[in-house]
Amino acid sequence: MNEAQTKHDLIEPALRKAGWGSVKGSRLRLEFPITKGRLIGQNRRATPLFADYVLEYKNRRIGVVEAKKRDLYYTDGVGQAKDYAERLDIRFTYATNGLKIYGIDMEEATEGDVSKYPTPDELWEMTYPTPKEDYKVEIADWKERLFSVPFEGRGGTWQPRYYQQNAIAKVLEAISEKKDRLLLTLATGTGKTAIAFQIAWKLFHAKWNLRRDGSRSPRILFLADRNILADQAFNSFNAFDEDALVRISPKEIKKKGKVPKNGSVFFTIFQTFMTNANQEEDEEDEKDEENEEENYSIAAEPAAKYNTDDFNFGQYPKDFFDLIIIDECHRGGSRDESSWRAIMEHFSPAVQLGLTATPKRDINGDTYDYFGEPVYSYKLKDGINDGFLTPFKVKEISTTIDEYVHTSGDEVDGEIEEGKTYSESDFNRI
């Protein structure tokens, strides 16, 4: 009996007997895609990874089953089962040949034979035991409420990659647990804006807010350091109703004489918020901001010296925003001496989610000091190995910036020796 027949005749009937796919809210996902397969050149890829079965309940992945044909030993798939569970951040995983079942608890590091598959409710209770303390009940209720909101699939054209779903889940869990400084570290090109959108979408439709009373949807601020990033995010959030989205710009503030407050999801750049609210901006000022030059006068002043009432962000009450998403947060926004820090300190009651592609290093350690360790990370090498990013090679080249040979017609201050190759160290001595 081959693997396909083993699945059809033995494994799937056993899973369906346990209620997977028939119990309300449960799904039996067959051939669940995990990776695309690393690009290996000439339009070819390595073999992509698929889990034979993923067990979903209440919009959460809570089980994996790795199948082998009946004639193989039932534990032959244990290594794959563990690998898939680790990638998908699933606690319970199973290996089977249709005749016997081997179960693994990834959290407790226990494993052994099991007589049958758990039902959806049983596996849910195994994964998320019913809490007894009141505060844990409230946390569990918010988790279930947030995860019950489906992903916004853009008409069936978008499905989260496994690491995107992991990142979204980790943030929602942390918010449910009342954590207020969060960090996601994901390589460039892995879809951080899409992740941010889905987080905002779920929070909005679950009516989460800082009071956690479910009485209203949250007010969310997406804060970037460049207009192009703020504009891209604004466009990426277009599944929200048009009147829910607000692009905060100097032109609109100047036109209305105040910052906009009617809306649900706001987008702006730090420079707009750090503009002096009492200062008239002329066309040249607006051009400077469009060029995103970080040369505003208070940039070197400690945050504690700022009078927040003097700046646009100070027109908002401290608790106006429930969630602030800081894009490219490694660019200095969390440094104690940074003018950007004043914004985050002003809105300190909000949950603040930092997005970065930069792993922790000496030069950006203060970002990690401020937000803490990432709730989820996805590295560049992971994206390449999984086939979501293209491999690259570093090639060293010399440019005209590195070396210079004088030719007739060049205007240079100083004395030049014809035919000599000047290096970068010579430039300031010519």
PLM region descriptions:
Residues G365-I430:
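Interdomain helical connector at the RecA1-RecA2 junction of SF1/SF2 helicase-like NTPases
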Residues F313, G332-V351:
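Short, conserved "post-DEAD/DEAH" coupling segment immediately C-terminal to helicase motif II
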Residues L229, T272, H330-R331, K360-R361:
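Residues immediately C-terminal
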Residues A244-V259:
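Functional beta-strand-loop-alpha-helix junction segments that form "active/interaction loops"
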Residues I269, D327-E328:
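Walker B catalytic acidic pair
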Residues A233, A277-Q279, C329-W340:
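Conserved ATPase-coupling elements of RecA-like P-loop NTPase cores
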